[in-house]
Amino acid sequence: MDIETANALTAFTARYCDAWHEMNGTWPQSEELYGVPSPCIITTMDDKILWQPQPFSLEQTVNAVERAMDIVVQPAVHAFYTTQFAGDMQARFANETMTLLQTWSENDFQRVQENLIGHLVTQKRLKLAPTLFIATLDSELDVIAVCNLNGEVIKETLGTRKRDVLAPSLADFLNQLEPVL
């Protein structure tokens, strides 16, 4: 596993949870994840849950993606999706506000891998370099992704060759993220 990426993700998650504690006096809350089983759930309330990150309990790889696409996935992406179970987190990098995607549960991990495969299949059809998304933006056409050829974190316009490099590595990117509540 890419320890640098795992540590950067854990550190950002701690910053995010600390910000929730400072602002709200609780662990992060989610209405979207209400009713969705996860080891992260601390408390279920009327229409929301409180969550805290939990250690990832499965094999720490996205091998299903590698097998399906016959590629080797960047080690940083393995670490990103298999370091922890957690809720998605709002974040800011430079002027970009995003939702950092996380694996919520064992079942969610399967769904995440299926979505990554679908993304890669589309890119292959369009003859685009392979990327693996890690965050969504308000614009449904843009995502934050890791280029699988060189490990750079990019802002990518889906279905096009438009890509802007944001950071040389996923660890660098995560270390620069600021929590947004």
UniProtKB/Swiss-Prot annotation:
InterPro entries, per the entry: Syd, Syd_sf
Disulfide cysteine pairs (residue numbers): none
GO CC annotations on file: cytoplasmic side of plasma membrane
Keywords, comma-separated and alphabetical: Cell inner membrane, Cell membrane, Membrane
Ribosomal protein as UniProt keyword: no
Stored Gene3D superfamilies: Syd protein
This protein's record includes keyword Cell membrane: yes
Membrane topology reported for the UniProt record: Peripheral membrane protein
Pfam family, any one: Syd
Subcellular location: Cell inner membrane
Coiled coil location: none
Family according to the record: Belongs to the Syd family.
Function description: Interacts with the SecY protein in vivo. May bind preferentially to an uncomplexed state of SecY, thus functioning either as a chelating agent for excess SecY in the cell or as a regulatory factor that negatively controls the translocase function.
Name recorded for this polypeptide: Protein Syd
